[in-house]
Amino acid sequence: MKLKFKHQKFQEDAAKAVCDVFGGQPYKTFDYQVETRKKDGQTSFEKFTGFRNHPIVPQLTDEIVLKHIRDIQRAQQIKPSEALEGKYNLTIEMETGVGKTYTYIKTIFELNKRYGWCKFIIVVPSVAIREGVHKSLEIMKEHFASDYSTPLSYFIYDSKQLGELNAFVTDSKIHVMIINSQKFNCLLYTSDAADEL
């Protein structure tokens, strides 16, 4: 049985709102020289290109981002934020059962379309939700392929699957890494593990 997904305005509005926060950011891809480590611990630079999201341009100041957020909040009759919650720590809230997963996948495609961003990490609270997100991406892949010409690759983080990590770094198409929060925090806050990521 094949599932059919309807385009719903509130989901499109949510994706647009997230993109509008970064209004003024130009469409750019950002390539860089990839660093690899040899087994003996020595660092070497390979002669291949990696891709990452282009940094937020300096003209898009915190004040401008906060203004964009407040404009979006006022349009939705939400009390405007007094300050940013951190460097672009956006909280997007939706009711249960209204298609949050669909909406954030759509948002990924829209951020790519508007700004050229192509690297996304979905951090989930549990292994069960991680598996559910992976399945949702699999189910919705064809649906989004009909709306967007950019292919999307996705995988569950596994430090033993270096091919997936290599593709995440070196490929210019949209890549989504799914990781549970415990592993993400371990990689983020452990110096030895941070080198692994």
Task: Tell me the role of every PLM-derived stretch.
Residues 189-197:
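Conserved small/polar residues in nucleotide/adenosyl-binding loops
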Residues 11, 104, 133, 178-180:
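Conserved structural-core and active-site-/substrate-pathway-adjacent residues in large, well-folded domains
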Residues 87-104:
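Walker A/P-loop
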Residues 1-73:
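Helicase-associated low-complexity/disordered flanking segments
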Residues 147-188:
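Inter-Walker segment of RecA-like/P-loop motor cores
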Residues 102-115:
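Walker A/P-loop NTP-binding motif
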Residues 118-140:
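Conserved Walker A/P-loop ATP-binding site and its immediately adjacent core
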Residues 70-83:
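Pre-Walker A adenine-sensing motif
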